[in-house]
Regions:
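Proline/Glycine/Serine-rich low-complexity intrinsically disordered segments
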Residues: 1-150
Length: 150
C-alpha cells in the first residue's frame, strides 16, 4: 500500500487534557461512532478510555464542537479535513497518534493495475518509492492534508 489510513483522536482545545498522549484522555469523555471499526479499535487499544457512542459522524463532531465530549476517535483523513474546515469553527485539534491497525483498518490504499502489466507496476512502485525517499510524497500529502494524516 502507498497510503495507510490511520485512526486519530481529535480534541476540543477547550478541554483540559493532561499530556500529549492518549493516556491523558482517561477519565475524559471520548466519542466514537457506534458499530464502527473505530469503536472496536478504541476498546482494544485503549481499554482505560470509556467510549461515548454516537449514531453517526455528524452527531459525533457536533458534540465535540459543542464540548459535550472532550475528544473523539475516528478516521484520520476525515478528521484532518474537518479540523481544517470552517465546519469545525477552529474548536479542535488532532491529538496523539496516528494509530495503524491492519486488523481493524485494513491494508491501506493501493493502486490497481492489470495483473499482467508488470512493467507498469514496477514503474509506479519505483516512482512512489523515489517520491517517498526524497520527501516529495510527504510534501504532496501536506499540500492536500495540511494537518497531516500521520
Amino acid at each position: 500500500p502507498y497510503l495507510m489510513l490511520p485512526a486519530r483522536f481529535v480534541r476540543n482545545i477547550g478541554a483540559s487534557v493532561t499530556g500529549t498522549t492518549a493516556a491523558g484522555l482517561a477519565g475524559h469523555s471520548v466519542g466514537v461512532v457506534k458499530g464502527t471499526v473505530h469503536e472496536a479499535m478504541l476498546a482494544a487499544f485503549f481499554p482505560a478510555i470509556k467510549a461515548q457512542p454516537f449514531d453517526n459522524k455528524e452527531a459525533l463532531l457536533t458534540a465535540l464542537k459543542e464540548r459535550k465530549i472532550d475528544a473523539a476517535f475516528a478516521d484520520a483523513l476525515q478528521l484532518s479535513f474537518w479540523v481544517a474546515s470552517s465546519a469545525s469553527d477552529k474548536c479542535c485539534a488532532l491529538f496523539d497518534g496516528p494509530y495503524m491497525s491492519e486488523h481493524f483498518l485494513g491494508e491501506g490504499m493501493t493502486i490497481m493495475l492489470r495483473q499482467n502489466d508488470s512493467v507498469l507496476t514496477a514503474a509506479i512502485d519505483h516512482a512512489l518509492a523515489t517520491l517517498s525517499r526524497n520527501g516529495r510524497l510527504q510534501e504532496i500529502y501536506l499540500r492536500y492534508f495540511p494537518y497531516g494524516l500521520y
